Amino acid sequence: MSNSQRPAYSYRPMTPADVPLAHALSVQLKWPHRLEEWAMLQRVAQGFVVEDAGRLIGTAFTCPQGDYATIGLVIVSNEYQGQGIGRKLMELALEACGSRTAILNATLAGAPLYASQGFVDFGHIQQHQGHALPPVPNDLRTDERCRPLTAADRTDQIRLANAGSGLNRHAVLNDLFDIVEHSVGIEREGQLRAFAMLRPFGRGRCIGPVIAESPEQAKHLIAVLLAQVPDAFVRIDIPSDSGLAPWLEEAGLKQVDTVAQMARGTPPQAIGTVRQFALVTQAIG
């Protein structure tokens, strides 16, 4: 269809009233997101929708996080694909980034569009999931201890999350704190050095973010969280260079997908001794 023949679709900002329709669209595409995940993203990010005669047929989000903005849940209904709708949604999402560097996690289908808009690969994310066989937590250093976290630890969690991801996680984590089921951390010399969170997500639970100084710390935290939900379906999204994949496979969390990390500019870098071993979500980073 030529540009002159294309229908005049309506593009506008997403509102809370759009969330159920956006969720229904993702269900049609067999995406696992629950209504609550859509509502969270609508709270912490700027969303866009496209309609055809009042019917919601596409979405996209921009989530500002300091000097960066993550773009996610770029969806176009199957019967409307190939008409440039995804490209227009991406243009709106990029405009919402302002001066921030845009980053995203690209599916195989979406990668060519993002590459054409100036995005370049800088890594890969592996999606692991399944009914876990909770492993025995590995030993920590003698001067470290693992403990449940409370509201008093939230400032330190945000500090670590910012350093580990290179993003400003203040708004994202403050929203997550209200829905998290379990949050555990590793303390050394009276200071929080690492933490991980478990919450409802998709078909069961999700572990993330995981912020730690080493794979050993990350494994310990994940093992402790898995022990809290021994019969649950669990998902975790990890950088491919995290060193966790073989251990997760042994624990029953099989790799089911890989997506490309892409940036339109210099990608974020971890600061100091910690790094991010598991994402919040692929849409948020």
Please name every model-derived segment.
Residues F48, G58-A60, A69, V74, ...:
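Conserved GNAT-family N-acetyltransferase fold
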Residues T62-G72, Y80-Q81, P200-I207:
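A conserved beta-turn-beta hairpin within the catalytic core of GNAT-like acetyltransferases
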Residues Y11-M14, V19-P20, A24, H33, ...:
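Ligand-binding pocket scaffold of soluble enzyme catalytic domains
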Residues F122, Q127-A161:
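Surface-exposed beta-loop interaction hotspot
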Residues T101-N105, V120-P134, Q255-P267:
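Conserved catalytic-core motifs of GNAT/GCN5-like acyltransferases
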Residues Y114-F119, L248:
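Conserved active-site tyrosine of GNAT-family acetyltransferases
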Residues M1-Q5, T15, P20, E51-D52, ...:
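Intrinsically disordered, low-complexity, positively biased terminal segments
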Residues R34-G58, T70, H124, D175-G185, ...:
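A short helix-loop-beta-strand connector motif used in the catalytic cores of GNAT acetyltransferases and
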